[in-house]
Amino acid sequence: MPSMYGLPAFVSATELLLAVTVFCLGFWVVRATRTWVPKGLKTPPGPWGLPFIGHMLTVGKNPHLSLTRLSQQYGDVLQIRIGSTPVVVLSGLNTIKQALVRQGDDFKGRPDLYSFTLITNGKSMTFNPDSGPVWAARRRLAQNALKSFSIASDPTSASSCYLEEHVSKEANYLVSKLQKVMAEVGHFDPYKYLVVSVANVICAICFGQRYDHDDQELLSIVNLSNEFGEVTGSGYPADFIPVLRYLPNSSLDAFKDLNDKFYSFMKKLIKEHYRTFEKGHIRDITDSLIEHCQDRKLDENANVQLSDDKVITIVLDLFGAGFDTVTTAISWSLMYLVTNPRVQRKIQEELDTVIGRDRQPRLSDRPQLPYLEAFILETFRHSSFVPFTIPHSTTRDTSLNGFYIPKGCCVFVNQWQVNHDRELWGDPNEFRPERFLTPSGTLDKRLSEKVTLFGLGKRKCIGETIGRSEVFLFLAILLQQIEFKVSPGEKVDMTPTYGLTLKHARCEHFQVQMRSSGPQHLQA
């Protein structure tokens, strides 16, 4: 007979056992996924996720946008789940600085993601989860090698440093190449030629050699790097849902294949360097690392050996730090120049006033060219083409803004949100280089430091200084000599596509013309 509450009066033992089992399983799942939080702290807030996939649908194809919207609702420290993995998302400049700079030791780790283990056989200095003394010593070595063969001066050259020499050579070649293409075809895709010029600069620094633009070896490097960015752009759910690693996955297979090709290619180049190496005659970064490898010690303060494999992985990390970011930065710059001709004219007027046409721009001219610097900063900010840093992880239990974050927690840092924060910029969607200038026309250093693109703290991009200098000099030399525009009636698509870096649609309708006055062949 029915009970007074409309439920059956009698329940079978099987039904009762099933109900208890379901309740216990549910209780266990809740307990297992719930983190113990110390007294006085809170768990980071966030939306409810779906079983198994967590917030993967919420994050979607444009994580920088969806996570920015969530930060407006939940604050600068929020938590989502990708699969069953909790991920803390940091937004807001002050919060990110607090985590990565003031609490840098707490947040300097890398998560042990499956895809990271596939990059240079899991030995990459950039992606490896190691953040101890060995990692720190290798990072110092890489920084010193990069500085020696870029910022250091070449006594046999008229240029102020190796970087200036290599960039000047490539920028001038690029001007000639674009003129030739214009004469033959009448329009072009600048990325096609720019990417080879930038690759040549980092090849000269890493391997001591420059390639012709149609050299198959150089083109293979460029193609591999482009494919790497395209493949990684799709992301890897297998990083957060382990069972997917054992299922057919074309993207993951392509990622493995690309890493194997890149590693083999670099290994071949470095093997040739070992064959021709002469102690005391250091030609490039690879030679410098080989010398340290043979000395078997990174520095006098670290009893750490440098194996032959580590030489390959460090060179790969340096190549990556100096290639895709610079190419993407200059490519976006050209897009903003053709869509903002007034800005292009102002840059060229500044170049004419400060430098003239009788000599080429040099790195030492940077302080005297504030409008060009402001344009570059606004390109970095508005495009935010590195929307997130490489994921961080916590090295120990810690807290941030009153929220508890346990050891080993994966942390996303939303740089795009910082660069589009209305509280910082007022009109973040407007492209306006003048925002970085003071009333007297000088660069506003306080505001320029708020642009976030290369990360912060102990995992900051080691190629930042080189990259900024390279972007400046390429643009200064190009804009001194030529004017960029698009074919009449053609529109430029500035919509970014999400990936390792945000890429705009390729445009095949660029045109250039030599500027109307001044000599075409300038003194370096």
Curated annotation (Swiss-Prot):
Annotated catalysed reactions: an organic molecule + reduced [NADPH--hemoprotein reductase] + O2 = an alcohol + oxidized [NADPH--hemoprotein reductase] + H2O + H(+); estrone + reduced [NADPH--hemoprotein reductase] + O2 = 2-hydroxyestrone + oxidized [NADPH--hemoprotein reductase] + H2O + H(+); estrone + reduced [NADPH--hemoprotein reductase] + O2 = 4-hydroxyestrone + oxidized [NADPH--hemoprotein reductase] + H2O + H(+); estrone + reduced [NADPH--hemoprotein reductase] + O2 = 6alpha-hydroxyestrone + oxidized [NADPH--hemoprotein reductase] + H2O + H(+)
Pfam families named in the record: p450
GO CC annotation: endoplasmic reticulum membrane; mitochondrial inner membrane
Highest taxon in the source lineage: Eukaryota
Induction: By 3-methylcholanthrene (3MC).
SUPFAM superfamilies: Cytochrome P450
Region entry Mitochondrial targeting signal, spans: 33-44
Localization terms from the record: Endoplasmic reticulum membrane; Mitochondrion inner membrane; Microsome membrane; Cytoplasm
Pathway stated in the Swiss-Prot or TrEMBL entry: Steroid hormone biosynthesis; Lipid metabolism; fatty acid metabolism; Cofactor metabolism; retinol metabolism
Protein residues bound to substrate: F228
Binding residue positions for heme: C461
Membrane topology: Peripheral membrane protein
PROSITE patterns: CYTOCHROME_P450
Major site of localization recorded for this protein: endoplasmic reticulum
Sample GO molecular function, one term: flavonoid 3'-monooxygenase activity
Example GO biological process: response to herbicide
Cofactors, names only: heme
Residue positions with a glycan: S71
Job description of the protein: A cytochrome P450 monooxygenase involved in the metabolism of various endogenous substrates, including fatty acids, steroid hormones and vitamins. Mechanistically, uses molecular oxygen inserting one oxygen atom into a substrate, and reducing the second into a water molecule, with two electrons provided by NADPH via cytochrome P450 reductase (CPR; NADPH-ferrihemoprotein reductase). Catalyzes the hydroxylation of carbon-hydrogen bonds.
Subunit structure, interactors included: Interacts with cytosolic chaperones HSP70 and HSP90; this interaction is required for initial targeting to mitochondria. Interacts (via mitochondrial targeting signal) with TOMM40 (via N-terminus); this interaction is required for translocation across the mitochondrial outer membrane.
Protein family: Belongs to the cytochrome P450 family.
Protein name in the entry: Cytochrome P450 1A1
Organism: Mus musculus
